Amino acid sequence: MTTESKTKTVTHILGYPRVGAQRELKFAQEKYWRGEIEQKELLAVGSELRQRHWKDQSASGLDFVTAGDFAWYDHVLTTSLLLGHVPARHNNGFPDLDTLFKVGRGQSQNSCGCGEAASDMTKWFNTNYHYIVPEFSKNDKFNVSWSQLFDEIAEAQKQGHNVKPVLLGPLSYLWLGKEVNDEEVEQGFDRLSLLPRLLTAYQAIFSKLSALGVEWVQIDEPILALELPKAWADSFKLAYQVIQSDVKLLLTTYFDGVEHHLDKITKLAVNGLHIDVSAAPDQLDAIVSALPKEWVLSVGAVNGRNVWRADLERLHERLQPVKEALGDKLWIASSCSLLHSPVDLEQETELSKETLQWFAFAKQKLREVTLLADALDGNQNAILACHQYSQPLRERESAEHINKPAVQQRLAAITPALAERAEAYSVRAQHQAEKLGLPLLPTTTIGSFPQTSDIRQQRSAYRTGKLNEQDYVTAMKGHIADAVERQERLDLDVLVHGEAERNDMVEYFAENLNGFQATRFGWVQSYGSRCVKPAIVVADIEREAPITVSWTQYAQSLTTKQMKGMLTGPVTILGWTFPREDITRKEIAQQLALVLRDEVSDLQQAGINIIQIDEPAIREGLPIKKSDQKAYLDWAVEAFKISAASAKSETQIHTHMCYSEFNEIIESVAALDADVITIETSRSNMELLKAFEDFNYPNEIGPGVYDIHSPNIPSQEWIVDLIETAAARVPVERLWVNPDCGLKTRNWKETEAALENMVKAAKALRKKWQSNAA
């Protein structure tokens, strides 16, 4: 029997969702960007959300509330402004909130649409969250210029909270950025050389934190979970010697284990270490054994990246020996920031009682942390509560409707041949050229068109029963017809139906497949004001009937041009949903691949000659340790190929990827064997094409020629320059012209203006190059 401990287990979280339970921040941001509210109104929304979230943390019994996790766009961009590190094109003196939005979006409030280019955006490790990439040059200086962190600490202290600020560490900040001057790089510049200057700014930050009476700072160094180059790993010791102060540092890691750097970590001038035992449970024992006696160990036991209820009973059993070994040096926390979780499960009033008992959102995870800590402290009521809390998970393990025999039989029948097209690309390309009759530099879009308020209202009315199915179908067909008419007027070569019926490229499929659970308010931030609502994989996945065929077939009936069928690929559906935790990700991907394979067959049979299987998330699913990546890529590629391999040779399979760095996965991208790949490249000025050029990528490619994430409208000349840059790296006969990504978040006015310039640019170069060839 566990006796009550005399040492209290300290509790905290690494961060909290900032968007609000009703996406209040998103709507306020967008109103501000449209010029509908003043900045003071936006600031008031942020303050109200922070105070609510701190109150939730305090009410749950956490020993610290976390400050500094709030961001107006993303926390890396916030760090850039804190450090006074703003690209020169956006730097008009002292940085302010409009500066931040200009770096992230290219402009702040509505303007002429001719702002400076936004900074690059990429995925945050292997999550679906994004950050704005810091830009580094050899003469960069850093100085504390942006008071948000200090203001928010004071704000929380004023509310009476015990505050633990969070700050992105100096090595991770440098690692997450990029050198932007090719000439400097050629001369030997490496952003790591900026570390001494950067550390001076961090010293100033800690001086200010000390003056605010801060005892502990959570300093995030997630790159310690990576297999770092020696120069980077060796830099930690000096960096933390330089920035040590009278403020205690909790060195914070997440998303994977750090035992491979343990010998270096234990020599750092810090006061504690946070590890993610949800992502990497096997590291725990080695770290407990090696932990310096004076350090605290914060164990990230409650998964911040998924929605499943924590198995508190098993966690208590696993961590009890750790508590006995460490006593009051043990802290309990979320594995990572809870910004990757939806806000509050209590809003999900439409879920069944059984289903509700499987899940915990961010607000519920606060109580999981404190309940587990109480149990570890020997509180008998808490120990009993942990047992009872885990019971629904035990009952689910044996539920017959979770593991389905028919699905298991199809999985067992998978062979290597199931993943192969009938003929090689070189042969397929000839069949497709004859069948499709497309011009040089064919123009197309990535799939979605603007989701107008009418579309959203009609979908909502249908979902709530206010609009019957017949009227809903009529309304959606009207939007499809409008999209087709606009594309024909623009003279695009390959059309799409616009996806008016789809709320989200993943959620739509999840709602039409068995084995998923959708939510009403399960929103999580993706970037800036963009939020996504991932479905939850709860059981084996099956398709009862075709999902996309009727809409695509209707769109094709309206035009003599080729209409693309639009599917979301198995790896992306997996990556952008909350997966089951009782089977492997590979098995979920295979289940998805089989149902998408059936959809490809049905589209083909319905007369659709081009089918796009989007895989924008294939790179973000990579394990963050390189040594683990091959196994993932093997099954990810296999899943895509199973999806596509039912296509005949004359059926052209497209795929789309965005925000990806292709160098390290180019072999796997080629192994997908898609006939055409479209990629996001405009922000990076076609830099990403170098990987395809160096690899001699054999199939067709459509590098994005304008950035759909920015409201700026690209000129025809700008697009011509990008196409010419692309043509220097990809044979023009294999080149497509398209935007970077889908257009659902844009409005029709800017969409048509941009596409008009894109088509004109393609036609001008088509005429020029065909004349030269003649």
Swiss-Prot record:
InterPro entries assigned: Cbl-indep_Met_Synth_N, Cobalamin-indep_Met_synthase, Met_Synth_C/arc, UROD/MetE-like_sf
UniProt cofactor(s): Zn(2+)
Cofactor note: Binds 1 zinc ion per subunit.
Organism domain of life: Bacteria
Keywords assigned: Amino-acid biosynthesis, Metal-binding, Methionine biosynthesis, Methyltransferase, Repeat, Transferase, Zinc
Residues reported in the UniProt entry to bind 5-methyltetrahydropteroyltri-L-glutamate: R23, E24, L25, K26, K123, R530, C531, W576, E620
Active-site feature positions: H709 (proton donor)
Residues annotated as binding L-methionine: I446, G447, S448, E499, D614
Record protein name field: 5-methyltetrahydropteroyltriglutamate--homocysteine methyltransferase
Gene name of the encoded protein: metE
